[in-house]
Amino acid sequence: MNIGIVCYPTYGGSGVVATELGKSLAAKGHKIHFITYNRPIRLDLFSENIFYHEVRTPSYPLFEFTPYESALASTMVDVARFHKLDLFHVHYAIPHASVAYMAKQILRDYQLNVPVITTLHGTDITLVGRDKGYEPVVRFSINQSDGVTSVSHFLSDSTYQAFDIQKDIEVIPNFIDLSRFRRQNKQHFKQMIARNDEKLLIHTSNFRKVKRIPDVIKTFSLIRKDVNAKLLMVGDGPERKPAETLCRELGLCDDIMFLGSQNAVEEIYAVGDLFLIPSASESFGLSALEALACGVPVISSNAGGLVEVVQDGQNGFTSDVGDVEKMAKDSLSLLTNQTRWQQFSDHAAKYALNFSKELIVPLYEEYYRKILDASHITTTI
């Protein structure tokens, strides 16, 4: 198949999943065309089956804001026409689903029918999409998609509750490359960070309010009272500066390391003892799954799709949003009991096998064929 993938090319979950999906499909022989405004962060290899098409937005004095949606639609049309795309797979509803609808209508003028599959990832539905300024467009563009997938049952249910959606939503969970995210012996790396054999806690995110970064630090502060530990904060975003300020106020600057955005996050997971993710909302929790695959138990909130990844009392613990005391208590129950920690670690790595790319990517291929078959029938009627 010739597949056009539209996504945000950033460190966020939707961009990571879209890019990894494209890479996996290319490895299986499909022609993958990424259509984005920048080269995706995870697009770090050369393949004869992967093509990148940059969306260039014109800048004119008349425009207060550059017309990205129009430029994206035009690029999608151009790629579909001259590379004979079989379908578009757009990730994140805003604005990609509505732009894809526009591109599809334009392509009909060229007697081309290119189906659109929209994958919902989270805040496009749970946060941004519920804004009254976006709701009609989100609802319309989802209903006009030829196929719709969601990364979790929670997100699928939330979409039906928030919008008048007539389409069936196929739940296909996120996946990981287990050859990359796996247990590794990085003891030399750990000794460089934890010179006094401290326990290492990890948090990775885009540092936005929904991630509740202060809860990460407050939980760590409580843990630090009973256990010698350090916290590795991986990522960047608007909440990083306030987080650094909070660290200073709590006198934790020597124990918390802000590492910024990192590509080789698996190297960091390899030295971790616990992963903290106290988010107010998560559609799935890809970073939690990555940690589990590396044998790192997860301490999380019970928000959204996290409960589909973190099995409370087996590979980690879940708590109500904001309950930092329980998160700290659960953390200490593992950090102070090596036998129990090892049981959780073993279960974490085993559970992650259910989300391997070898199991999940074929589900997308099957869904593509289903939508293409239905589109062909519709076209010929």
Which residues does each PLM region occupy?
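A short, well-ordered alpha-helix in the C-terminal region of glycosyltransferases
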Residues: K326, S333, R340-N354, L363-E366
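Carbohydrate-associated surface elements
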Residues: F154, F175
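Aromatic "clamp/platform" in nucleotide-sugar-dependent glycosyltransferases that forms part
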Residues: S261, A280
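N-terminal strand-loop element at the rim of the active site
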Residues: C7-Y11, K23-Y68
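Short hydrophobic beta-strand element within catalytic cores of glycosyltransferases
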Residues: P297-S300, V310
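A short helix/loop element that forms part of the nucleotide-sugar donor recognition site in Leloir-type
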Residues: R182-R195, I377
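Conserved donor-binding/catalytic core segment of Leloir-type glycosyltransferases
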Residues: A194-K211, I217-F220
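Conserved acidic donor-binding segment of nucleotide-sugar-dependent glycosyltransferases
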Residues: D312-G313, F317-V324, S333-Q338
